[in-house]
UniProtKB/Swiss-Prot annotation:
One of its GO terms (molecular function) is glycerol-3-phosphate dehydrogenase [NAD(P)+] activity. Catalyzes the reduction of the glycolytic intermediate dihydroxyacetone phosphate (DHAP) to sn-glycerol 3-phosphate (G3P), the key precursor for phospholipid synthesis. The active site is at residue 165. Its EC number is 1.1.1.94. Belongs to the NAD-dependent glycerol-3-phosphate dehydrogenase family. NADPH binds at residues 14, 34-35, 82, 114, 229, 255. It comes from Trichormus variabilis (strain ATCC 29413 / PCC 7937). This is Glycerol-3-phosphate dehydrogenase [NAD(P)+]. The lineage of its organism: Bacteria, Bacillati, Cyanobacteriota, Cyanophyceae, Nostocales. Coiled coil: none annotated. One of its GO terms (cellular component) is cytosol.
Length: 307
């Protein structure tokens, strides 16, 4: 395998996990963080891949900083951030592509809980790009006997799968926190996936992408693991804590909280029916209790499963 120089943006749990995967494959790895002492300008020198694992709120600022430094035209950008920009409703890859229109941008997303990756437990992920050679380069850089990487030509679908499932994960935490049982959980995850597909189709994503690792796979992992911050938000809301109390002690960012608000705004503009997401939004806003949100979902007008 050809040795590659990779710059990881973000020294949080996910950034550190990805850095370790690349190091284990023999690549040269540099890590940038806001608290670090090295400048972006110094770290960018002779870099082949720039991988962003920063939180959604920092993406545009960091992309703009790198834009001003004029990276090599051969540099591949990879985004492993899951979220939406509130002002533009852009995904992370759309922000990177708008800043670097002549560079390949690759999305990395899948059912990847960083703690399990760090324990070398087997996992799989997806790298997606319109530029097949760029996706293949990233695939080779991160694939190993414990981390299987697939390519996909639908970057927006792969990216939205990882982003939209965070909202359903909050609902899943509520479901478990209220002890609603396996039947309710199965119904919630399945109907949540339907909402993800509806929103994704509006964006031009392929339906089948949502039934792959970055959609259903990530949804199942996040909705069933206490390791998920979004799941924890829902679980603790069901336990009677306020959103402010939960976020104050949460390690890291629960992107689903911000994503939910953006999705509801989009759905109302585009007339997309997303009842689970709507109830999560109302719960986060303090407009309903977890039990009231459940009742409103169960008492909706009856209808066919598929329109």
């Amino acid at each position: 395998m050809q040795e590659t120089t990779i710059l990881i943006l973000g020294a949080g749990a996910w950034g550190a996990s990805l850095a370790n995967l690349a190091l284990a494959n023999g690549h040269r790895v540099r890590v940038w963080s806001r608290r670090g002492t090295e400048t972006l300008a110094a770290l960018l020198e002779d870099v082949d891949i720039i991988l962003s694992a920063i939180s959604m709120k920092g993406v545009r600022e960091v992309a703009s900083q790198i834009q001003s430094l004029t990276p090599s035209p051969e540099t591949i950008f990879v985004t492993a951030t899951k979220g939406l920009e509130p002002e533009t409703i852009y995904t992370p890859s759309q922000i990177w592509q708008s800043c670097f229109p002549n560079h390949p941008v690759v999305v990395l997303s899948g059912p990847n809980l960083s703690k399990e990756i760090d324990q070398s437990l087997p996992a799989a992920t997806v790298v997606a790009s319109r530029i097949a050679t760029a996706a293949a380069t990233v695939q080779l850089a991160f694939s190993s006997s414990r981390f299987r990487v697939y390519t996909n030509p639908d970057p927006i679908g792969v990216e939205l799968g990882g982003t939209l499932k965070n909202v359903i994960a909050i609902a899943s935490g509520v479901c478990d926190g209220l002890h609603l049982g396996t039947n309710a959980k199965a119904a919630l995850v399945t109907r949540g996936l339907t909402e993800m597909v509806r929103i994704g189709n509006c964006w031009g994503a392929k339906t089948e992408t949502f039934y792959g690792l970055s959609g259903l796979g990530d949804l199942l992992a996040t909705c069933n693991s206490p390791l998920s911050r979004n799941y924890q938000v829902g679980y603790q809301l069901a336990g009677g804590q306020t959103l402010a109390q939960i976020l104050a002690k949460l390690p890291g960012t629960a992107e689903g909280v911000n994503t939910c608000q953006v999705l509801v705004q989009l759905a109302r503009q585009q007339n997309i029916v997303i009842p689970i997401t709507e109830q999560v939004y109302r719960l986060l806003q303090g407009e309903v209790t977890p039990q009231q949100a459940l009742d409103e979902l169960m008492l909706r007008d009856i209808k066919p499963e598929y329109n």
